[in-house]
Amino acid sequence: MNNIRTIKGGVNLKGKIKVPGDKSISHRALIIGSIAEGETTIEGFLYSEDPLSTADCLRKLGVNIPEIKKDKPFTISGLGINGLKEPKEILNCGNSGTTMRLLMGLLAGQEGKNFILTGDISLNERPMGRVGKPLSLMGGKIFGREKGNKAPISINGNKLKGCVMGTPVASAQVKSAILLAGLKASGTTSVIEPASSRDHTERMLKAFGADITIRGEFGRNVVIKSGGSLIGQKILIPGDISSASFWMIAASIVPNSEVLIQNVGLNPTRTGILNIMNSMGCNYEILDKSTIAGEPIGSIKVKTSNNLKSFIIEGDILPKLIDEIPILTVAACFCNGVSEIKDAQELRVKETDRLKVMARQLQKFGAEITEKEDGLIINGQSKFHSAEVDSETDHRVAMSLAIASLLAKGTSKIMRADAASVSYPTFWEELAKLTN
């Protein structure tokens, strides 16, 4: 990653766009389609590095996935829950934590088969014990560096037993891994979270015919019963609200802007950013609401707002906007008053330490940000000057810095800007279109 982008401040954003397909749903459509019976057709797939890593690993497990082409639907021939093959080579998950953690759950119960998962330098330093430990309690045989916490990860497929599992943090990846393992475990597997996390896995498993029940306060208890089979489906993947968030915030804070973002997923476990935009006093409306394959979608129209209010992010809302914290940090710099992000320790083990990286890079523009162990304190009403900043290889940091550059006086440079392609390959083209 050595690509440099130059961005001129003082321009506005006008126009309408469609953002790429939802990354979370793209991963899950591939994985669940692979273990369903019959064919699954996927439209709106996110053609980017992370979901393509998932596709590559599944091919090595014997799944017939054709070459995926940008903006083209494709069809998977599923192997059924018991049909995955033992691979002849190591499964490389690239930079994708979702790929590695969900595959750990998928493969733990594949009796008598052995698997090795690895990733790039960054992924191999991210914590995997949070998935490995609950799977081990179900009978999984999972090994890795640093007592199973770091990849490369070795999995000896074993007979799993259903159980009731409480997770220490609200994590969709941990929950999803346990639910996928539950498909192969004896009896019933129940996951109880401290707060509700993204529920794309539950919605999709249900659409494919799994015996899954969601109960408890705010849907924090998910129960799956093994023994059934999944049936292939037609999946239309909505636009990713995490990718849309860059334009939603940009149109709110860049003067004289108006942007319409079409066909965005509005799953209530993902719309925390709308709650924060409400408290900021942002000027937006949701149009053309509908539901496709159990996922609510709509278009979001955003206009510039004056006198935005500062905000606090803490507690149960975190899982609903965890990926939007970098761009909300940029927004906070232009609100009135002091904003605070708390309870966000999880960001320290993302692709980078996002708290540290966002503070370090935005300070180069002149932002006043104090880093805390679990978050950030951000002084508003900043006057940004141009700067040379660095994504530090993190896709969400790269795109957040691009939006920050629009509010800086003069011309800024973003180093390693090609990191954006991990989740949004056309980001720079869309930025040029909206600012032209």
Swiss-Prot record:
It comes from the Bacteria. GO terms for cellular component: cytoplasm. GO terms for molecular function: 3-phosphoshikimate 1-carboxyvinyltransferase activity. The active site is at D323 (proton acceptor). Monomer. Phosphoenolpyruvate binds at K23, G97, R126, Q173, R354, R396. 3-phosphoshikimate binds at K23, S24, R28, S171, Q173, D323, K350. The gene is aroA. HAMAP family: EPSP_synth (MF_00210). The keyword Transferase applies. One of its GO terms (biological process) is amino acid biosynthetic process. This is 3-phosphoshikimate 1-carboxyvinyltransferase. PROSITE patterns: EPSP_SYNTHASE_1, EPSP_SYNTHASE_2. Catalyzes the transfer of the enolpyruvyl moiety of phosphoenolpyruvate (PEP) to the 5-hydroxyl of shikimate-3-phosphate (S3P) to produce enolpyruvyl shikimate-3-phosphate and inorganic phosphate. Its EC number is 2.5.1.19. InterPro entries: Enolpyruvate_Tfrase_dom (IPR001986), Enolpyruvate_Tfrase_sf (IPR036968), EPSP_synthase (IPR006264), EPSP_synthase_CS (IPR023193), RNA3'P_cycl/enolpyr_Trfase_a/b (IPR013792). Coiled coil: none annotated. Pathway: Metabolic intermediate biosynthesis; chorismate biosynthesis; chorismate from D-erythrose 4-phosphate and phosphoenolpyruvate: step 6/7. Belongs to the EPSP synthase family. Keywords: Amino-acid biosynthesis, Aromatic amino acid biosynthesis, Cytoplasm, Transferase. Its main location: cytoplasm. It is found in: Cytoplasm. It holds the Pfam family EPSP_synthase. It catalyses: 3-phosphoshikimate + phosphoenolpyruvate = 5-O-(1-carboxyvinyl)-3-phosphoshikimate + phosphate.
